[in-house]
Amino acid sequence: MAATTAAVVAEEDTELRDLLVQTLENSGVLNRIKAELRAAVFLALEEQEKVENKTPLVNENLKKFLNTKDGRLVASLVAEFLQFFNLDFTLAVFHPETSTIQGLEGRENLAQDLGIIEAEGTVGGPLLLEVIRRCQQKEKGPASVEGALDLSDGHPPSKSPEGKSSANSTPSKIPRYKGQGKKKTIGQKPGDKKTSSETSQSEPSVSLSESKSKSSLHSLAHETRIASFLSSSAVDARDSSALCPDGDDVEGDSFFDDPIPKPEKTYGWRAEPRKQVGGLASLSDKPHLRSGLSSLAGAPSLTDPESKRGSTVLKDLKLVGEKIGSLGLGTGEDEDYADDFNSASHRSEKSELSIGEEIEEDLSMGVEDGNTSDKLDDLTQDLTVSQLSDVADYLEDVA
């Protein structure tokens, strides 16, 4: 009975399966399922080929660099920097990507390899910072670092036979002459490192004495040039005044550009009483004038036919006197020769005396003298060389 029921159930399942397949084929669902299954099988086969031929995630350049000693040292410094500041997330990426999960050196081994000595229990910062500091110190002052290493050995500095330090000593800030450095290296070997405290104390005094002597020589030469310039200018002024007494040449000289001091009392011509004659101590570097026409003292008297010629000469002399009076070429009793070299006029006011007036007076007295054609030429030259008398022959107040 059980066998018959099992056979009935099997027949029913077969009929149900056939009916289901026929229904799915008629609706197209079965064909679509078969196509999707075939596509999934092909995709699975393609993905399997890609996974097998896929290149591993390895950086060849980094791998070659880490195989060297310096490369592992750099990677260890970076890892120590991240560990010092507890950058755990960055370390989680750094180690897998560089394939350095194991094999990097610790802080103590790194400090020993780099020659960094740390006191126990004192950690100032990452080792990478100490490496950068040492590089900066070497760039700034290699000489000072070498001196510190020499002093750390505990050996006292040796001295040369002359007691002078070698070229490795600290340079002095006081300027020295070029020849001093050459004298300093005499009798020393190039490889010796010698210093001397006595030399460092004596060198500033020697350089100071040399600078003082140089400055004194410079000032002496400067004073000599000034004295020669002043003497040459005085000689040129005398020559120009003796050769060219007229006012046209005098006006071009900057010596007469100083303002003329106004006197309290002035004197002028008898024919032109309103015209003032200014005084100027411009002839202070010339000899004193004692007489206006001393050169005509013993000249022979003029003849009557030549009196007309003398009057013509008188007019010319008046014109010359007017030019001289307009320039104010007067002298006083006391002359200060130092005033010629001062830019500011510190000249004291002195009594004025017109040279042109004295020319007219002396000429009127000597009109009847002898032939003065040659004497009158000497007259213009004597005006700048001779000195006026202390007492004037004629004075007239100006209204």
Curated annotation (Swiss-Prot):
Polar residues: bias regions: 163-172
Please list the residue ranges that the record marks as compositionally biased, kind Low complexity: 197-216, 290-302
Annotated Basic residues bias: 175-186
Annotated signal sequence range: none
Question: What is one cellular component GO term in this UniProt entry?
Answer: centrosome
Modified positions (Phosphoserine) in chain numbering: 152, 160, 202, 301, 326
The places in or outside the cell where this protein is found are: Cytoplasm, Cytoskeleton, Microtubule organizing center, Centrosome; Cytoplasm, Cytoskeleton, Microtubule organizing center, Centrosome, Centriole; Cytoplasm, Cytoskeleton, Cilium basal body
- The chain residues annotated with the modification Phosphothreonine are 170
**Does the entry feature the keyword Ribosomal protein, yes or no?**
no
An example of a Gene Ontology BP annotation on this entry? positive regulation of cell growth
Which superkingdom does the taxonomy of this entry point to? Eukaryota
For this UniProt record, give its keywords in alphabetical order, as a comma-separated list: Cell projection, Cilium biogenesis/degradation, Cytoplasm, Cytoskeleton, Phosphoprotein
Is Iron given among the entry's keywords? no
Q: Which residues form the LisH domain?
A: 70-102
Which stretches are tagged as biased composition: Acidic residues? Answer: 246-256
Chain intervals with Basic and acidic residues compositional bias? 259-275
- One MF annotation (Gene Ontology) recorded for this entry: protein kinase binding
Cite the InterPro entries for this sequence.
FOP_dimerisation-dom_N, LisH
Residue(s) carrying Phosphotyrosine:
337
Subunit composition and interactions: Homodimer. Part of a ternary complex that contains CEP350, CEP43 and MAPRE1. Interacts directly with CEP350 and MAPRE1. Interacts with CEP19. Interacts (via N-terminus) with CEP350 (via C-terminus).
Query: What family is this?
Result: Belongs to the CEP43 family.
What task does this protein carry out?
Required for anchoring microtubules to the centrosomes. Required for ciliation.
Protein name stated in the entry: Centrosomal protein 43
Organism of origin is Mus musculus (Mouse)
